[in-house]
């Protein structure tokens, strides 16, 4: 097990080194030819965002000598870099000639609405299809929340958010993150606190379906966590995150009687400290919806029990490769995997595919627990629409981008579970394929409509609002 974890992590690091070497080669290539001096970088439209936050994202600085042959390409590269900040609805860079040897750049930005009070209605189930088919669209399984989020607190890209949620899951939360605490803008810190409780929860998996238990008027599961993190961002695309998290769980005796391994050995209380290190290499063109580039994410962590738990280590990995063919065709491969040790762990940590964004498309109705899993997604897309509605009569939504991508896709996956029981989709290969359409718009909005077949001969139309 340790060897597999080491090899996976070594693979991710090798990918990162390869991309960094390629970046150095590209930089050297740009250094040839006739050059002009970048005299000034002017910025317009940043009524809230500080100038240094924008300059931090750029690959050029005032005084740099830029190759004339690459000037437009560099301007577009930096426009995309600035747009990847979750702050702007539009970014434009104009090149202003000064004389034969000098140019200025004018960066024009349209700021988003940073203070976002949200009234949210979220489903407690894993996806909309599960809620409709298995829970008969029971509105009692919805969560009504009021969230206050400031995405550019004090103009420094700081985030401050608070949430109060009622309904199926009652939740209170507070989170703060300051991306830069130093003059070089490389080091950041953050902290968060969350509490939740439910009258109903799943206590086991049988036949790759969650089994639920409920006690009306009694909260049978409670969860509290507090976390702090440190982030080091030495360059534009590289990010290192170290996090320490305290987590406390309490379950009603009813859950323990139904599943003694829920927290392990019949315990109804679980307290742990969790420590993680995460490395991100993000060399894609658009962080919200990539179409070209490479993305590598590696996470290594361990959990130490303070009560009702021993020790668990894990490694998660993701490699995404995105390629554009011609002007309209897009191809992507996304590989994800997870390894944990030991195999004998509480049920609540024995998750693999079927929750969140980790699933083989076509198996959205199933939960596939496991201690290890691998998932590969392949997509071929066509850029049918790439336009924007301009001069919209709302200040913070003056430009509404609209992109539509018809696609075909195929997924394969495998989850290892030594305690599979009656679940029949574990410890075997899974495959799904289909066609669909992605719709992307402002404020990181994404909508995926997918019609999928799986190896069981089942088919259906699925709706998702998260990324692939």
What are these regions (language model features)?
Residues 193-234, 337-371, 458-463:
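Outer-membrane beta-barrel translocator/channel fold
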Residues 186-330, 411, 415-418, 426:
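Transmembrane beta-strand segments of outer-membrane beta-barrel domains in Gram-negative
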Residues 34-192, 266-290, 372, 415-420, ...:
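Outer-membrane beta-barrel initiation region
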Residues 120-124, 147-151, 163-167, 177-179, ...:
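Outer-membrane beta-barrel pore domains and translocons
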Residues 272-399:
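C-terminal outer-membrane beta-barrel translocator/porin domains of Gram-negative envelope proteins
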Residues 140-144, 168-172, 220-226, 269-275, ...:
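Residues that define the transmembrane beta-barrel architecture of outer-membrane proteins
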Residues 276, 380, 439, 458-468:
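Outer-membrane beta-barrel "beta-signal"
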Residues 88, 112-114, 153-155, 181-184, ...:
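Outer-membrane beta-barrel channels and translocator barrels
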